[in-house]
């Protein structure tokens, strides 16, 4: 693998935090990443608030939509629980 290929693969890795309470969870994602995930921005529901340049993607719908779009574009998604 060339250095260019290795660097290209490294930029395709994203790390996010999953925040939860007793009844729900949200994935904390920078607004830029939501914008870069093709077709996701316009499909985000009102259950996923945008605060301080970060979306909190609700687990039942928006989190999966974002995850699927990113993995379809070759990204590796790492999620840690808070």
Model-derived regions, located:
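Short linear motifs at secondary-structure transitions and domain/linker junctions
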Residues: 1-5, 30-31, 53-54
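Context-gated lysine
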Residues: 12, 32, 51-54, 68
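Low-complexity, compositionally biased segments
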Residues: 12-13, 36-39, 45, 63-65, ...
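A short, structured beta-strand/loop element
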Residues: 21-51
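Short, compact, well-ordered microdomains
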Residues: 56-82
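N-terminal, charge-rich interaction modules
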Residues: 1-16
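Structural boundary micro-motifs
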Residues: 3-5, 49, 60, 71
């Amino acid at each position: 693998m060339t250095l260019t290929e290795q660097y290209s693969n490294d930029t395709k890795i994203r790390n996010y935090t999953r925040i939860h309470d007793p009844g729900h969870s949200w994935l904390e994602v920078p607004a830029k990443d939501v914008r870069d995930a093709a077709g996701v921005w316009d499909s985000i529901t009102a259950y996923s608030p945008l605060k301080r340049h970060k979306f909190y993607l609700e687990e039942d719908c928006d989190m999966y939509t974002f995850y699927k779009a990113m993995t379809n574009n070759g990204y590796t998604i790492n999620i840690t629980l808070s």
